[in-house]
Swiss-Prot record:
Kelch repeat spans: 146-197, 356-400
Domain F-box: 7-53
Pfam families given in the database record: F-box (PF00646), FBA_1 (PF07734)
Superkingdom of this protein's organism: Eukaryota
InterPro entries: F-box-assoc_dom_typ1, F-box-assoc_interact_dom, F-box-like_dom_sf, F-box_dom
Transmembrane segments: none
Name of the protein this chain belongs to: F-box/kelch-repeat protein At2g43445
UniProt source species: Arabidopsis thaliana
SUPFAM superfamilies listed in its UniProt record: F-box domain
Keywords annotated in UniProt: Kelch repeat, Repeat
Amino acid sequence: MEEERENTNSIYIVSELLEEIFLGLPLKSILKFKTVSKQWRSILESNLFVERRRTLQKNHPKILAAYNCDYCTRPGILPKSQFEGDEEIVYLHTDATQPSMTCDGLVCITEPGWFNVLNVSTGQLRRFLPGPDPGPQANWLLGFGRDKVTGKYKIVRMCFHDCYEFGILDIESGEWSKLMSPPHIMRVGSKSVCVNGSIYWLQISVSYIILALDLHQETFNGVYHLPATWVTQDTQLVNLEDRLAMAMTTKVGPEWILEIWSMDIEEKGWSKRYTWSKAYSISLAHRVVVSWPWQKRWFTPVSVSKQGNLVFYDNHKRLFKYYSGTDEIRCLSSNINVISSYVENLAPLPLKPSHTHHDLGNSNSKFSTSRCHLFPTRGSWISKVFRRNVLFTSLVVVGYIYLPL
C-alpha cells in the first residue's frame, strides 16, 4: 500500500514537472508532443494547462489578419511574422469580406448555411448548422464568446425580423438551445464583442444602448449610460485589455481626434453599475485622416503594449501604432485586412457524434497550411532554408512615421 502511494506521488511530480517544461515550449513543439503518449496529450489538453498557457500568451499578443488571393481557394493558415517593435501578425487565408467573430484566438466565420469555428493555433475546425428555424441569414444578429465559468465557447444567433428566434449553440456539445427574448430589438448587422464572459452589441438609433448577454447565466442586461456626446454610427466596440472599450473619431475644429473610452463594472449583489473613463485622446495628423466630406473613416483599437502604445487600424486597410511617450503615429502597413487581436490558445475543439459533419476536401477537422505564391513552395530550396532557421516566415516592412503637427 505504501509502495503504491509512493508511485502515485512520483507520477504526480513527473506530470507537474512536464507541465512546467511544456509551458515554455513553442507552439509547434507542443502540437508535436501531443502525439508522443496519452499522458502527454492528457497534460497538454487539460483545462489547467490550456488556461495557464493562454494566460502566459496574453503577455505576447499578436494581430490576426485575413489574406485572400485567386491562387488558393481552400481556407488555410498562413503563419507570417511582420515585426515592428514587438508586433507580430498571423495571416488566415480566408475571404476578408466574410463576416467573422473572434474570442481568445478562436475565429467563427459565417457562410451560407454554416458556422465555421477555427482554432488558429491548433488548426482544428468545426462546422455547425445554424439551428432549427433560423430564418433568413440576412436578418441574423450574431455573437461569439466564451463562458468564463465553464470555459465553453458559444455562438449566439438572434432574429428580429420575419420571425423572432433567439438561440445559443454550445460548441462542445454541438447542440442549440433557446434563449430568452432580449429586452430590446436590436439592429441587424451590429458587430459583437466578447469581454470576460459576456457578449456586447452596440445599438445606435434614436437612442444609444449596449446590449449585454452573460454567457453563463444566459441573461440579458442593458448598458444605458454611455458617453452619448460622441457616439455615432462610426463608433467601434472592442475588447481592449479585457475591458469593453468604445472608439470614435471626431472632428474638433480643424483637428481630428481619436477618443477611446473603457468601461468598468461594479457589481453589488444582483445589480451592476457601469462607469466609463477616457483611456486615450489622440490627435491624428492630416496625413492619417483625409478630410473629404464624402469619405467615412473610423479607427478600431487592436491592442495596447506594456509601454502604453496603442495599435489600431482604419477602414481603409491601414494599420497604425501610436507611441504615447513621443506622441507619434507610425504606419505599420498600408494594405492589411485586420480581423482582431490574437492570442495563442490550445483549447481543443472536441469532435462528437452530435456534431454535424461536412466534407472539406480531405478532412472535416483541420484547416490546411496554405500554399500561396506569397510564400516559398514546399520542397523548394528556399522553403528548406526557411524551415531550418525560423518557425514563421519573416517579412520586413519599411514603415513611415506621422509626427504630430
